[in-house]
Amino acid sequence: MIAPALRKPLAALSLAALVAGCQATPTTELRGTGDLGVVVERATGSLAVVDTSERRILDRVEGLGDLSHASVKFSRDARYAFVFGRDGGLSRVDLLSGEITHRVMQSGNSIGGAVSQDGALVAVANYEPGGVKLFDSETLEEVADIPATYRDAAGETRRSKVVGLVDAPGNRFVYSLFEAGEIHLVDMNGDTPELTRFTDIGEEPYDALIGPNGRYYIAGLFGEDGLALLDLWHPEAGVQRILPDYGRGEERLPVYKMPHLEGWTLAGDEAWLPAVGRHEVLIADADDWSLKDRLPVHGQPIFVMRRPDERQVWVNFAHPDNDVVQVIDTESREIVATLEPGEAVLHMEFTPKGEQAWVSARDSDRVVVYDTRTLEEVARLDSESPSGIFFTDRAHRIGL
């Protein structure tokens, strides 16, 4: 039994020890990650870790390889960023310490990835060799290798490039095979991957998206007009073709850059999407996928991104009109602002509740932050050749 006279000193000592044990180390600030994000700096193979509350760069992480078409996903706790390099490198970056905790060279050429619903697995889409590899999200140890095989017209077994890889509810992954014209659905609930193939979906699927509720997977087709839709609530129904006129059409217009399907916007019962090769944003009915309207815009749109409250849509454009961002009011369908953030605008990202929009201008070496209410610039960050911008709220959103 502790004597009464010793209780207060011992309690004070215990409290001091507890506080000391909880203090942040000099290299790791004790803080949350909900307002953090990263900017890909493609020329230097680095990430800029940013604070969206203070609108500043906190740290830079180097040694990430070829980031010319890099994408980023986040761990379930939003502390770690998984960086998918074009050179096949997969890196796990600690946003708080600014360190690479793990890195593997898992293929010769990769094009993105996804994190499973339970956060335990990281999947990587590979061009070379074509397929999907799965890794433990804490150690980056390989868990499974799923070759993207198909039979060509001569009956020979080939491997296809994998595109449009996303996570789906039920601890599943969905992706498309470019050369094969297939969609594959992988269930990871058992000891081994369970693969379902959907064939003859259309020619050369080049990108895909999954809706915010995880029900519909939509693949864009490079080799023909139209889109391929898979209802993940009823996969047994197979793939449905929608928007048959979506594409380059009979008049094969020059396309400076194929629009990203991730840049589509689902706002209420409407889908807002970039036209291919035309200076238009298209509006489709999200129930029957009929085309409702065409809005003329500044150039060939790449990303058509909604503010989280769905009141605004922000649009950037392909070369040579890629120094402009236009803002559209979704109610009036009018362009309410034409912004000039800098040369070669590549990406846009909203803060979680939409009060800010961050825009990367690669050839101007800067990221510009806008107030989405006033549409005024509120900050400018120096960044060498910035491209993709990714905020940690993506950790808790399907397909992002």
Stretches with model-predicted labels:
Residues 2-11:
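Bacterial N-terminal signal peptides that target proteins for export
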Residues 11-20:
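Bacterial N-terminal signal peptides
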Residues 4, 20-21:
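N-terminal non-cleavable signal-anchor helices
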Residues 22-400:
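Predominantly soluble domains enriched in secretory-pathway, periplasmic, or organellar proteins
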